[in-house]
Amino acid sequence: RYYHDEIGYNYRLEGLQVAVWSVSLKYLPEWTKRRQEIGHRYLKEITNPLITMQRHPENTTPVFHLFVITVPDHEDFIRYMAENDVECNMHYPVPCHLQKAYANLGYQPGDCPNAEYLAAHCVTLPLFPEMREDEIARVIDLCNAYRQA
């Protein structure tokens, strides 16, 4: 899932995918609005100083496809959330320049320090349109309680 040995492309959509996506498109504005509500709530209510959240320029409107935070130790945070029945994920734990598929380009660890830092510290919080208010509140409460005792 996270490790790529070769560069690949797949531009084909199968008929079933097209049918599902065609039906789903009518819900996109509603889903986007809900994702934005949840994302803005996270931004406002998660106040733990160990958690850094992405900030967006005022002239932009984020959709919150993912809600990515950075923490000092992403494995510890993911474990903590899992112990409290909240699933979080790492996204792209290996930066592109260190993937086997790009080994021929000669990049080494340290060549892209920002990408490497983010790969080691990013966590994606749950955020999906169907989240209930109690689930959202639980994520917020757990984030705020993380390593604060």
Task: Please report, for each region that a protein language model flagged, where it lies by residue.
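PLP-dependent aminotransferase class I/II
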Residues: 1-149
